[in-house]
Structures are given as structure tokens and as C-alpha cells.
């Protein structure tokens, strides 16, 4: 599109400079018409020629002209208006020159709308000759013969050095303007694109509203913990009493001014552990080194196991009275931290039922209560364990610490159960029923 514009401007400039003009001037009327000079006649020089136009007689000027130009007092030259046809252009011009006219204006006899260059022998031709259209000839014919009507023949610059320089200069100026416009438009687009991408690339921080929402504290003393408790990792200055510290979700502390500038202007993670400060969860984000089971999942599994053990202990407690096992409890052994295991031997005869002691009654009452206290739950879990109820366990761990003495129904007496001649290896229990398990921890082993 730019090249087409330059070419059009060039053509218009050349056409304007190459074509000569015929200017009609009368009082307040000024009309301009295009013409083209004859090849065999002298060209118009300088600023042009001014004269008065007359109509030729005969109009085609193929014969000697009957009318003669009138001598004017002012410096105007007589011009003759001739129609095309009947004879050659050269003959018409020679007849006009012989009659005393200074220029011959020949117009077309048909309305073709185009100008043609007249050709002929230039020998002996001393006057100017131009060709105009039929429309221009009709207008000039109306104003012919009036002394106050002037016709100005403007020369053509087609063959002059000035025309070549002017065309070259205007063409160069137009091309330079187009190239400069394209250059500045392209540069402006590149600057806009670069500034937009740089603004997006430079913004890495958080909003001040999110940073101010993080907890802050006033430093009072040094603490031994997992945080940066002595020196700010950003400015490398020691904390002093009264400094305002900002606490990130990863529990690292920094000067409030330092970490606020870091989070809002540079990055959104902790300068120490690289954890994203926009996350408020207690667990760090998952990575390749993250364990399969987190601490939250393990604590949930442990609490579920403790709850199941506690519920099974409460269910066993109320059914103590219906057990056919012979169990004897004494107040001394109820308050002791050791429980002796007794197993009933397999026999066909059933031992007579015995009365349940005070400890068993208390156990049933506490188990039947709707919401036992933590101390009661611990006591119930301890007294209602499978070992204290007489149920044998087949675990290899329990058989290792099982008493070698197996009482039979005939020798199951309180005296024998309370005797110290048969040492037992009881399990040590903890304060809560939820941790009573041989696989819970190493602390459950005896004398560890």
C-alpha cells in the first residue's frame, strides 16, 4: 500500500510538471486549461507569454487568414484560435505566422478528451503552437476578440533541468516520509510490547494486604526453637527487645519491614526454607522427598486404634457377671500396677460360682455410666483387659511373659493366687487404655 501511494504521488507530480497551462483571465474570472506544446514549434520560455486571442478566418486556417492582428499599445501579443482538421498542423501554424500572430492555439474538432502532440517540420517556424481540447476551444472562442480578456501561456517544465530536479526531490521526500512513518510506527509497537512484557515479568510479589494479614509479634527474649530466633536472615541483624517480627506460615521469623519488602517486591516464598508464604496449611507442599504417610495420617490412625481398643474394653466390662470363669479380685491387687494372669484348665466339671468382689462391682458401675471420666476409662480399660478377665491370648509376645503356673479348678484359691512363691511376669500398663498394646512402643516392655 505504501509503494502504491508513492507511485501515485510520483505520477501526479510528473504530470503536473510536464503539462503546460492556458490561463484565461478577464476581470474577476480566471480559468485554467491544460495544453501540450507542438514538437516542431519553439517552446514557451520563462514565465510564459500573455496575449489576446482572436478567431481565425477561415477557422481551420487551411488557407491564408483573412483577419490581421491589431496592434495593441500594451505589451500583449496576438494569439489566433484554429480548429483541427482540413490540413496538417504544420500548415496551420505557418499560415498563422504569415498573418502576423505570435502564437497559434489549435483545439480538437471532436470531443476526445485527450491531448496529442503535434508533429511537423520545424524549419522556419518562429511562433509558439499549443494543442487544447474541444471544450477548451469553445470557451476560448466565447471570450475571443475582447481587449480586456487576456490569455496566459505557461511553459512546460518537461524537458528542463529544473523539472528533473523537482521530480527527484519530491519523490525522495515522499519516500523518506513513508519510510520514516513505517519506522516510527514499528518502533512504537515494539516499545509497547516490550514495556508490557517487562511489567508482567517484573511483578513477582504479593499484595500488601495479604502480607499485613500475616501474624506479627514483638521480640522480647531469645528462645531455643526451630525458628530463626536470633538473627534476621534478610538484613543479618540481631533481634533486639521491642523489634516487630513477622511470622510466616513456616514458623520462620524476620523483621517485619524486611520480610514485607521481600514478599511485596521480590518473591512470595520464605527466604530460608523457600516455602510459599501464600499457603496457610501446616504441612509443606508435596515433593519427591515427601513421605507416603504424613504425621497427620499417622496420628489419625493411632487415634482410631486407641478408640477401638477403648470401645472394646467398655463392651467387655458389663458382661462380667455372666462369665463362667472363676475370678478372684482383692483390694490390694486392684490398686497394684501388676495383674496376674490365671487360666482355667479344660475339664468337664464346672466350678461353683463365686461372688464377685467389690472391684468387679465398681468396674461394672463405671462401665455402665454414660460418660465416664478419663480416669475412669483408664481404670476400666485396665481392669477389663483380656488378661484380667481370664481369656488366654495366642500372641507369641504374651506367651513369652506368661506365668508358668496354670491353676486348676481344684487349686484356684486366694491363698495360692496371692502367694509370692510363684513369680509372674506381668505386662506394664500405661495411664490410658488407648496405649495398652504390646506393639505400641518399646516403653510397654518390662524393665526397658
From Swiss-Prot:
Location(s) in or outside the cell: Protein storage vacuole membrane; Golgi apparatus membrane
All residue ranges annotated as the PA domain in the record: 60-144
Record's compositionally biased regions (Polar residues): 408-423
Function: Involved in the trafficking of vacuolar proteins. May function as a sorting receptor for protein trafficking to the protein storage vacuole (PSV).
GO MF terms held by the record: zinc ion binding
Compositionally biased region (Low complexity): 344-378
Predominant subcellular localization, coarse grouping: membrane
Entry-linked CDD domains: PA_C_RZF_like
Leader sequence segment: 1-20
GO cellular component: Golgi membrane; protein storage vacuole; protein storage vacuole membrane
Segments passing through the bilayer: 164-184
Superkingdom: Eukaryota
Sites carrying sugar chains: 28, 74
Keyword Phosphoprotein recorded: no
Protein name, UniProt field: Receptor homology region, transmembrane domain- and RING domain-containing protein 2
GO terms of biological process kind: protein transport
Coiled-coil spans in chain: none
Keywords carried by this UniProt record: Disulfide bond, Glycoprotein, Golgi apparatus, Membrane, Metal-binding, Protein transport, Signal, Transmembrane, Transmembrane helix, Transport, Vacuole, Zinc, Zinc-finger
Region named Disordered: 344-380, 402-424
ZnF bounds (RING-type): 232-274
